[in-house]
Amino acid sequence: LWHRRNGVRQIVCEDDRTMTSVKFRTKFGNLPDDRIKFINEDSNGRIWIGTMQGLASVYKGKVEFIDRKLNFSSSFPHGEDMYFLTKSGDVYRCVNGSKKIDCLASLSAIAGNTSVSTHSLIKDKWVIFTSSEGVYEFDFQNFQITPCRELKINNGKVIHDNYGDCWAY
């Protein structure tokens, strides 16, 4: 359970059907910021909590701060690795099992000062919609961001329907 400005609570149902919970808040020292942007789990069961001022990981009950400065907007598991997108469009990766993130590409280097409005995986590319500079694709093979020539949408939104189709508008 999470709230955009009030941290997060992890609730676990144990084998004996009892429930336990842990609060994550800056005042408890287990979050870099209470303004939650996403919660995602990687293939190893590590929980990633992205905030407007940092990134934390939780694995087997242990919290680690990966970053305390960046404004994260979303995350995406791909293969064995976890990818992160900042509000300004920088793409970071955490290699499976690592405790650090590396910047792979910077949208601001090609698009200037813009912000991410949404994102989606389309044909094995991470498609990034920006508020004012159109649509870009991040290629997981060569770690490059390039303009998406097929889509010309500012401040786009994406919906995935129950048939698996992706609608961008």
PLM regions: where:
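Carboxylate-rich, polar loop motifs that coordinate divalent cations or form catalytic acidic clusters
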Residues: 1-169
